[in-house]
Amino acid sequence: MKVLLRCQRLRFIWLAKPAGRHFHRDPQLWAPLTLDDFEAINRCEKPLPKNFNFAADVLDQWSLKEKSGERPANPALWWVNGKGDEVKWSFQELGSLSRKAANVLTKPCGLQRGDRVAVILPRIPEWWLINVACMRTGLVFMPGTIQLTRKDILYRLQASKAKCIVASEEVAPAVDSIASECPNLKTKLLVSPHRWDGWLSFQELLQSASEEHNCVQTGSQEPMAIYFTSGTTGSPKMAQHSQSSLGIGYALCGRYWLDLTSSDIMWNMSDTGWIKAAIGSVFSTWLRGACVFVHRMAQFNTDTFLDTLTSYPITTLCSAPTVYRMLVQQDLKRYQFKRLRHCLTGGEPLNPEVLEQWKAQTGLELYEGYGQTEVGIICANRKGEEIKPGSMGKGVVPYDVQIIDEHGNILPSGKEGEIALRLGSDRPFCFFSEYVDNPEKTDATIRRNFYITGDRGVMDDDGYLWFVGRADDVIISSGYRIGPFEVESALIEHPAVVESAVVSSPDPIRGEVVKAFIVLAAPFKSSNREKLTAELQDHVKNSTAPYKYPRKVEFVQELPKTITGKIKRNVLRDQEWGRA
């Protein structure tokens, strides 16, 4: 029996009937194979197993359930590109193809367990294949977005000492221009229907690769992936995660925040270069046996997004607050989201007004979560619990979330301080292992018995967390501490404001004052700027404590953002203070 898989614009992959189990031969060495066991490990009710491999102990188990009829007929991966091309892979097909890909990485590419592989691919099925193939072979997966510049790629390859890079045609010229400066780089693997001098062809090698592959028996604490932090306050750090921190650590997230079952179809819009893609498009979703839905949108388009949401049976949606801000400006009541039942957001704070507008137009709640590359989801609004607009929700298991002062003392409810995680005698397995080659930065994340997030917040009497800002985003004016998010939330309530960013600006009397950079809605772009400035300032004074109003206002066409859509307040702040 053969299965035909249609892959991107007239490309096809033929594979034989999915092979049987090709992993841990000794059953006594298997990690726990039930979701209940993984969840119990997260709750600290069971010890972490000595060995664990996500491909063998999760994906291959869903493949067996699929084969025996214990899982619904949903695909494991459902990919579309809006041009009529579509890929649907079952867990069995994903298993067969990823074994072939594993053989490509270890044989023609010559990679060995522990080698680091930089992967710079857009949202295409091969990104998932390479990811799983790295799991099967014990290679360290290092994703990056295709928006990385030549300088970015050079930094990542040199800092990581990557042995191989897997990239698309868009990135190949930039890689070629700096490859000679990367002495550790031995192999360049191209994902493209075309050949490229100096590169191996992934498609050609995959066609001829064997499906027979024995999965490496990786240790639970063995390196699995390296994620480069967004670098809003300096050069990106390399946060290394273990097999278990990613592969087991998101079991409870999938149940309680994402609310997934094996019948669900999850559309997570995160770019492939960031850990949010790992959370929502790999680990949490596949731990639950759900379907990962992917749309290859080169750029976000509101019409395309809404058409996709109405045309496909998507049940669960996760996107950045920026997307929801754009969507609520549409008449959403015109659209019928047939199966959509659960909506999530994260990456930056969600303005309460957007949450309320989304619910008013769709009838659906919006569940915000807060986390970091280093430690995953820290707190979240969960189904069945009260949502307090503007709050990021309560701390999630296994974390003990606290607000502390600069000395590591726990602050009472309602007092602003640093968001921190209280630690026990052992470092939680779901933490990142380290910042690679940077022990000082790794050590700096711990203060007494707390992990320091670098963010400031407030916790109320019910344990709900309220975001104030990055520690270095907080504005101190005439002795008052002002968080940018509250001012931005007040501004967005005004119909003239599409988006805003609030930073400190030097002032000879107050030391620093609040300055707002504002993107105007189309109907207000021709307004008298002086009058509109005064109107917006009065609006903020009436919406929050008057001392927080922006004494300076600048109207801009767009705000500087990271590749993930986070506002780069540090760029605006440096511009104000003459450090740009």
UniProtKB/Swiss-Prot annotation:
Reaction(s) the record says it catalyses: a medium-chain fatty acid + ATP + CoA = a medium-chain fatty acyl-CoA + AMP + diphosphate; hexanoate + ATP + CoA = hexanoyl-CoA + AMP + diphosphate; octanoate + ATP + CoA = octanoyl-CoA + AMP + diphosphate; decanoate + ATP + CoA = decanoyl-CoA + AMP + diphosphate
Pfam families: AMP-binding, AMP-binding_C
Gene3D superfamilies in the record: 3.30.300.30, N-terminal domain of ligase-like
Location of this chain's protein in the cell: Mitochondrion
Cofactors (names): Mg(2+); Mn(2+)
Binding annotation for ATP: 229-237, 368-373, 455, 470, 566
Keywords: ATP-binding, Fatty acid metabolism, Ligase, Lipid metabolism, Magnesium, Metal-binding, Mitochondrion, Nucleotide-binding, Transit peptide
Cellular component, GO annotation: mitochondrial matrix
Tissue expression remark: Detected in adult olfactory epithelium.
Broad enzyme group: ligase
Primary residence: mitochondrion
EC id: 6.2.1.2
One Gene Ontology molecular-function label: fatty acid ligase activity
Organelle transit peptide: 1-22
Gene Ontology BP terms: acyl-CoA metabolic process; fatty acid biosynthetic process
Matches recorded under PANTHER family: ACYL-COENZYME A SYNTHETASE, ACYL-COENZYME A SYNTHETASE ACSM4, MITOCHONDRIAL
UniProt similarity note: Belongs to the ATP-dependent AMP-binding enzyme family.
Role according to the record: Catalyzes the activation of fatty acids by CoA to produce an acyl-CoA, the first step in fatty acid metabolism. Capable of activating medium-chain fatty acids with a preference for C6-12 fatty acids.
Name used for this protein in its record: Acyl-coenzyme A synthetase ACSM4, mitochondrial
Gene of this entry: Acsm4
